[in-house]
């Protein structure tokens, strides 16, 4: 094959490769659909409704003997423990361990929301978006009571912190958690169901 002919064949191949690389670059750096919804880039937020969510931690998801025999239980990114889902919003338990290293009467639990937004619908957010990418964090607990195997347990859960973004954490009474044979349930308030549609 002559050199001139090789150049004619290579030039379109190089251009095609360049186009593919540029397309991959722009797709990779494109903001996620969640961010586009929150910034109202191609989407309009049509409503925000305050909601509450009952969070249940099934004991069968945890390792045997936890928390009595375990130092800590942490879910890695590939082992997130899904606690709740409505199809587009998912709540995961990320970590559950003794508070402050080894306080035997208090547990610390960390959760995060993860989203799979469709082209239109609603999401359950732990903050109120302002439509320009900012938000007001307002997550709270209206009651410190937990439900331990369908029985109320007073003063068993307290808010530990919120943020960044879709993360929040709570303190749990270790005795109440250990008393649960099936599940430990508490209610999180001041969540926001945000409805959106394409513009």
Model feature map: region roles:
Residues 1-9:
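N-terminal Lys/Arg-rich, disordered targeting/topogenic segments
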Residues 8-199:
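Conserved functional micro-motifs across diverse proteins
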């Amino acid at each position: 094959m002559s050199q001139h002919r090789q150049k004619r064949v290579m030039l379109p191949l190089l251009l095609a490769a360049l186009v593919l690389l540029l397309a991959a670059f722009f797709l990779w750096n494109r903001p996620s659909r969640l961010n586009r919804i929150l910034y109202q880039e191609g989407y309009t937020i049509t409503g925000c409704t305050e909601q509450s969510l009952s969070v249940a931690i099934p004991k069968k998801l945890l390792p045997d003997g936890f928390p009595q025999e375990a130092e800590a239980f942490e879910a890695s990114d590939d082992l997130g423990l899904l606690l709740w889902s409505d199809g587009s919003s998912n709540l995961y338990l990320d970590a559950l361990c003794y508070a402050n290293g080894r306080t035997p009467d208090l547990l610390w639990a960390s959760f995060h929301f993860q989203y799979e937004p469709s082209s239109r619908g609603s999401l359950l957010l732990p903050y109120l978006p302002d439509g320009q990418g900012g938000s007001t964090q307002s997550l709270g607990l209206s009651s410190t009571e937990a439900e331990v195997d369908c029985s109320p347990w007073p003063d068993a859960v307290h808010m530990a912190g919120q943020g960044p973004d879709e993360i929040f954490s709570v303190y749990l009474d270790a005795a109440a958690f250990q008393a649960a044979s099936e599940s430990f349930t508490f209610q999180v308030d001041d969540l926001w169901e945000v409805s959106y549609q394409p513009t």
